[in-house]
Structure formats: C-alpha cells, structure tokens
Amino acid sequence: MSGERRLNGLSLKVGPLGEHDRLLTLLSDQEGVTRLAVPGARRPRSSLAAAVPLSLLELQVAGRRGLARVRQLKVLRSFNSVGKQLETLAAAQALAELSLMLVAGNDPLPGLLNTLLMHLERLEALSQAQPAQPNTTLACSVQACVHLLALGGYGLPVQECCRNGTALEPPLGQWEWRCSLMPEEGFAIGALPGAALQLNPSELALLQRLLRPALPMRRDGELMGPPEVWLRLLAVVECWIRTHLPHHMRALGMLREAIISSGDGRT
C-alpha cells in the first residue's frame, strides 16, 4: 500500500474511534505529533489492542492522506506502572498533556521525546518506591515541566530581571528580598503590584537549579525544599503555562490535589 512507513514513538493519548477502532496520538522524532487510526483495537483479542497511553511503540503505518492507519504494532516499553500511585499517574499525564501543547502538528521538536522518556523513567521508579515519595514526585514533575517548556521555546526566564535586565542573583539569607512573577513578562526584582506570585531568595534559587539535569539534593542525599515550596514552584509553572500556551492543564491541578491529599503538601 502506498505511503507505508515505520514510526517509533510514545503514545500520548488514546481514545475511541467508531465502534471498534481507536484514535492514537503519537509523539515521534520523525513526525512530531501524529494522529493515527488503529483498526479493530477495541475488539477482544485484537493484535493491535496494545495501543494504550504512555507506551513506547514501533508501528507499521499505511497512508499519508487523511487519517493514516496502523497495520502492525510492537510495544517497546510500557510506562503503565506509573498508575500504581495517583501522584505519579497525574504527573505522567501532565507531561503528556504539555508535550501535546508544545508540538505544532507534524513539526518535530528535537530532544522532546528523549527528554519526556527520561522523566517518565524517573516517575516510573518513584511509582514503585516504598514508602511513597510524593514530594519527590512533585519536584520531578515541576523540573520536567521546566525542561519541556525550555525545549518548546517557552522557557521560564529566570536569569535576569524582565524590567531592567539585571541578573537575577538571589541574595540567600536576606529574607526580606522578593522577586515577582509578572505572567506576561517574566521575573522582576522586588515586590511589585500585579505580580501573580512572589518568591523569596531560596525559592528563586531552587527554581533556577531546575534547569540542570538532576534534581537539587542536599549533601545528605535528601531533596532540597519542603513540600510547600515545591507547591509554590508548581504554581509558577501553572501560571506560566496558562499565560503563554493555549490550553489549561487539568493534570497539573490533579497533581496538586493528589499531593495535598497525601499529606505531604501544606497550604
């Protein structure tokens, strides 16, 4: 059949399509976000029934006009274990949702798939942790959003003041110092009217460290920052996404509720 091709990618979203088929939304390095029909995937014992969310798939696809169809499917890796904990499930759904918002149709975003897979691997490990580590899950989620936003061209401008260009160098120990999040502009030095949020020096320093590959850890191996600080940084990310991207992210709200319900977040 004309237009046959092989695609490797992560299933971000799967929904019903007619009575027996599924609609698969795939993120790949080759094509960005692609929507594909998976014929018969809702039938019992279908060979294509493995088309489920958060799975790394190898697909044989036919057709280039209209809605292409999946002819063969192989699961390379499944991240369904993130569903063992509500916090890791909400976090994984949030990352999938954000990735969909960042990719403009069939325009690939270099590095996005690998970065998303890296953070899903971290969430997968946290989903199996005993006892549960909701604060670390929250921190991983905030950092993952920071990384994905930067790749998508919507990075948080945490290096200089948006009003005068002065370097944002938080004076640790000066607790009266404040930095204001101005949703349309970025971060400005001082407690300014119209700010969505204000951060103290340690909160800004923690946010700046999220640009690095690893989470910020203390010398004793424990995560830096208490739950209430990570919830504030989540609010920063939520505000930035709400202002600069076209859709509200429901999954981040679910994550916030799950963290607070776990008792590891205080308001």
From Swiss-Prot:
The keyword DNA repair applies. Pfam families: RecO_C, RecO_N. GO terms for biological process: DNA recombination; double-strand break repair. GO terms for cellular component: bacterial nucleoid. Keywords: DNA damage, DNA recombination, DNA repair. It comes from the Bacteria. Belongs to the RecO family. PANTHER family: DNA REPAIR PROTEIN RECO (PTHR33991:SF1). Involved in DNA repair and RecF pathway recombination. This is DNA repair protein RecO. It comes from Prochlorococcus marinus (strain MIT 9303). The gene is recO.
